[in-house]
Regions:
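Catalytic core of pol beta-like nucleotidyltransferases
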Residues: 1-28, 35-40, 51-106
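Short beta-strand->loop micro-motif that forms the acidic, two-metal-ion catalytic signature
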Residues: 45-48
Length: 106
């Protein structure tokens, strides 16, 4: 059940972020909910990859997704842990990008 809810939440985030105008968007579920080890208390680990983040610092990126993040929390009554990447950052060999790729099961 935890995986189904998380996948619904990812779809919700993706739809809302597209409506908000984020370009070249990928929303990737990772962590325990992606790998099947989640409990009902687990958060939803999500990576958002978008070219709209290009040239933006962490705080600007957070502002860009803030309203959608709040909507998702209210809709699913779950905590979300969100990491944000440009496509180039996500495809890089950085520790955080490698972690997300591994924890997504890909």
């Amino acid at each position: 059940m935890a995986q189904d809810t998380a996948r619904q939440a990812v779809k919700f985030l993706e739809d809302c972020l597209k409506e908000a105008g984020l370009r070249d968007l990928r929303v990737i579920l990772f962590g325990s909910r992606a790998l099947g080890g989640a409990t009902d208390e687990s958060d939803v680990d999500v990576a958002i990859v978008s070219s709209s983040f290009q040239g933006k610092d962490l705080f600007e990126r957070a502002r860009m997704i803030r309203d959608v993040h709040v909507r998702a929390i209210r809709e699913f009554d779950l905590p979300f842990d969100i990491l944000m990447f440009t496509p180039e950052e996500f495809d890089s060999d950085s520790l955080s990008a490698r972690f997300v790729r591994a924890a997504a099961g890909s």
